[in-house]
A protein has these predicted regions:
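Helix-to-loop junctions at the C-terminal end of transmembrane segments
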Residues: 28-41, 126
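Helix-loop junctions at membrane interfaces in 12-TM secondary transporters
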Residues: 61-73
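A membrane-interface helix-boundary motif in multi-pass transporters
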Residues: 124-142
Length: 163
């Protein structure tokens, strides 16, 4: 919100972005559920979702007017609603029955860790540099994560056991 208000955008418009986020999550989840009835590829969903999240940070590099923030939030929400709900499904598919809970717990622990450390890291990065650097670091981090996930999935695809 500070970045947007520094650009002269009102808090009301900022709040509307979160309303847009919520509405889009519901709509996108309905669409994904419908698509998955006919064709489901969980890994493709994660790949596309992560790419889209990374791209949203690239868009923020150009955000000078409200429409850019709307576009970045829309792209972020598409990625968020595509990738993140899929990860527990993949963990469930790859985990033996007797230890599914353990692996779901590990996934949730790392998710919580990111939510705890992310704002602190972001705040420090903004204080030491700028929002622009933060957006570049976030985009690079997401794209590097995407590349690692893609390489690991492809390297282990032939010997992966689905439960």
């Amino acid at each position: 919100s500070v970045f947007m208000t520094d650009q002269g955008i009102s808090m009301t418009k900022y709040s509307l972005l979160w309303t847009l986020n919520g509405v889009l999550i519901v709509i996108i989840q309905l669409i994904i559920t419908w698509i998955n009835r006919y064709r489901s590829n969980l890994y493709l969903q994660v790949f596309l979702g992560l790419f889209t999240v990374g791209f949203s940070f690239v868009l923020l590099l150009f955000a000078k007017s409200y429409i850019w923030f709307v576009l970045a939030m829309t792209v972020l929400t598409i990625g968020e609603a595509t990738a993140f709900p899929t990860m527990p499904a993949i963990v469930n598919e790859l985990s033996p029955v007797n230890i599914k809970g353990k692996y779901q717990g590990i996934l949730n622990a790392f998710s919580s860790l990111g939510k705890a450390i992310g704002p602190l890291f972001g705040g420090i990065l903004i204080e030491l540099s700028s929002y622009r650097i933060l957006f570049v670091v976030c985009a690079v981090a997401v794209f590097v994560t995407l590349a690692i996930v893609f390489i690991v999935v492809k390297a282990n695809q032939s010997r992966t056991v689905h439960y």
